[in-house]
Amino acid sequence: MVSTTSTEKLGVRRGEYAGAETALVFSDCRAEFLALRSGCGVYELEWERQFLISGRDRVRWLNSMISNNVRDLAAGHGVYAFVLTPQGHIVGDLCVYNRGDDFVMVVEAAQADKLHAHLKRFIIMDQVEFKPAEEWAAIGIQGPKVEATLRAAGIEIPGLEQLQLADVKCGAAQATLVRGDHPLAPNYELWSTAGQVPALWDALVKAGATPVGAEALELARIAGGVPRYGQDIRERDLPQETGQMRAISFTKGCYIGQEIVERIRARGSLHRGFTGFRIVEGPLPAPGSKVQASGKEVGEVTSAAMLPANDGEVPVALGYLRKEAGATGAVVELGASRAQVEPLPFTLSAENI
């Protein structure tokens, strides 16, 4: 993936996010977060990496590698999935899209080399080609006004379901439009060649989209309760513990790690789960802070943020909690703070936007 826009010339603050250098803040993080919540924000996806999977055996091979079902995936549609160890632990997460003649696998840059090397080891006698889409670039767009903004930019929107894609045009630029699945606001991605993406960016900004940096996107991620691999999902975690049941097919048949996933389902033996915490007293806890209830350690914090609100900020955190301590509304201690357990995504009322 190459740089998608000329943000270096705009005086934005840049830095590392999800394994790649990108724009962190364009002007004001608070305003950018509010654009994602109540308007429309456009952002770089320099931390996104795409791989192309082709060859006669691609369906059978890929279906045996990941936790979701691509054997029955219709052309133009995608799924979210995990890559697991034989012990059922999570090596990484990804999205896979069926383009008919090949699959597109999308991962964060921080995971790309590891997952590419890990999966390639299992191509033995299979007729499968698995390679990076090195000349691709992408941008994202999100918010309640996203579809109106796309149309104002001259991009016709086919009726896409979540994780569905279609080819579109914007002036002379050709692109693939991909509908995302963010829980708080509609979101799309535009994939194209590196040479055409800047024209797409300019068209969306002229149509009213607010340039948004990675810091505001991270706030929106936490507000939506979306776990990130390496932050909220680690190799020691099990798929069902993450709460991302959309990543798992229980009917597809064998894949690496399937035996453990099925055993947990059959026995109902899940001892902890991913949840939200709304801080009611004390400072924002740091990731890694222990969660306690009645003097016992019952979980851990993995992410935390101060969400912008009209009257200040709302402190929240994400993390894992043992089931016996995890009833909604229960009060727990997060380091030096007290918090209420809250289901995800967080409920953000009018005062939060």
What do these predicted regions represent?
Residues 1-80, 84, 89-91:
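Acidic, proline/glycine-enriched N-terminal capping motif
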Residues 13-15, 79-84, 161-172, 331-334:
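Short acidic-hydrophobic surface loop/beta-edge motif
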Residues 18, 86-87, 99, 170-173, ...:
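Short strand-coil-strand connectors
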Residues 29-38, 81-93, 123-126, 168-178, ...:
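Short amphipathic beta-strand starts and helix->beta connectors
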Residues 41, 50, 72-73, 92-227:
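Acidic, low-complexity central loop/insert segments
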Residues 52-57, 141-145, 278-286:
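Short, surface-exposed ligand-recognition loops at beta-strand->loop->(often short) alpha-helix junctions
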Residues 94, 238, 242-258, 262-353:
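Glycine-rich, small/acidic residue-mixed loop/short-helix segments
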Residues 189-278:
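Anionic-ligand-binding alpha/beta catalytic cores of soluble enzymes and soluble regulatory domains
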